[in-house]
Amino acid sequence: MKIFNSLTKQKEIFKPIESGKVKLYVCGMTVYDYMHIGHGRSWIIFDMVVRYLRMRGYEVTFVRNITDIDDKIIKRAGENKESPAALAERFIQILHEDEKALRVLSPDQEPRATQYVPEIIKLIQKLLDNQYAYTGQNGDVFFDVRRFKDYGKLSHRHLDKLQAGARVEVSDSKRDPLDFVLWKKAKPGEPKWDSPWGEGRPGWHIECSAMSSSILGQPFDIHGGGLDLKFPHHENEIAQSEAGEEKPFVKLWMHAGLLEINKEKMSKSLGNIISIREALKESDVEVLRYFLLSGHYRNPLSYSKENLENGRLALERFYLALRGLPVVNHEKTSSYTDRFYEAMDDDFNTPIAFALLFEMVREINRFRDNNQIEKAAVLAAELKCLGNIFGLLQYSPEQFLQGAKKEADVQEIKKLIDQRNEARAKKDWKTADQIRDQLTDLGVAIEDSSDGTSWRQE
């Protein structure tokens, strides 16, 4: 098996530190808002990685953290007039609901930053002892970036060309703009913990270093996350972990490509996010999972209704091939499974793996046409087993196909309403009335208001 290592910028033969066992840490959510489908892509990608590694016989320890104390949590809690702890707890429950709705496997361990404050303090003290950290004039403790000679090795940037990143705060207390905070001095009304440097709370980056190493040891096999975390977050994790423990942090780094809308990254700051909950109102979970895994995990992926519809049609082909076949035990594998493994062993090449699944669909249909039902059923069982790695083909064919028809009907209704609104905007009342009649024939009642057009099925 070969996996692309962001640290070396090349595919490497994957050999776990301990034979047969894989220790994987993935950066989780900062719990102050709803998860959007950009997060969902990263979660589903690493869900696929865990499922595949386990299918290949590895004993995987999967750790994904929760950041439950952060500037954004404190700010949002203040706006909502609730405590940061209450806000975090509420969104942790929402996160778990979304995780279940996405069919994402729960991590083996899900540490919260607030549970690891003693370990964080211990690591900061090591950095101070090793002279990689200092206390600023404002009482915050900072990491001395220029003291760590390997800084920039993950993002492949030279220190002299680096600028303070989006999540690196500017402060007069820093020796260098790139220095980042390890411990923030307490402010009135904020959550705080005792430390040798006074009351305060951890910085964002140090949390992941302390949690991952405390649970998995150092070094461990794979650290994953979205591409947007590569710099400065993951770069800072390497610096503080290796400076503190004086040994390598992680063997292999994996980064999931970003989800884009109109060629822009999906992010809260750009205001173009679509929550998981909104997406699942529009599309079945299998359609969403198929779409999010259809491109190679390292590449950007463009979110659009057209791409989701292509995903629905693709799954329809799978389920039509499975419909009406007897259910048999999956006992034997064919060359299709070997070729599937070959694709997935090449840096989790899901586009090639999906192409192979479509080959299996065509073969199943050929067996059907030749009335070789037993052969079709055996291959269908193999197809379902491989589909499970992607969290797909979990419905009965009848269940999915009935739901897909309803989804297609809704999309058709929305399309007609959009066309009618365009006609009304052009004052083409004849066309608008014709479309209204079409909708009436479909059993759809529409109501126009200043907020737009609403509809219901009668």
Swiss-Prot record:
Zn(2+) binds at C27, C208, H233, E237. It is an enzyme of class 6 (ligase). Binds 1 zinc ion per subunit. One of its GO terms (biological process) is cysteinyl-tRNA aminoacylation. A motif ('HIGH' region) lies at residues 29-39. It is found in: Cytoplasm. InterPro entries: Cys-tRNA-ligase, Cys-tRNA-synt_Ia_DALR, Cys-tRNA/MSH_ligase, CysS_C, Rossmann-like_a/b/a_fold, tRNA-synt_1_cat_dom, tRNAsynth_Ia_anticodon-bd. GO terms for molecular function: ATP binding; cysteine-tRNA ligase activity; zinc ion binding. Its main location: cytoplasm. Pfam families: CysS_C (PF23493), DALR_2 (PF09190), tRNA-synt_1e (PF01406). The keyword Repeat does not apply. Belongs to the class-I aminoacyl-tRNA synthetase family. Monomer. This is Cysteine--tRNA ligase. It comes from Coxiella burnetii (strain RSA 331 / Henzerling II). The gene is cysS.
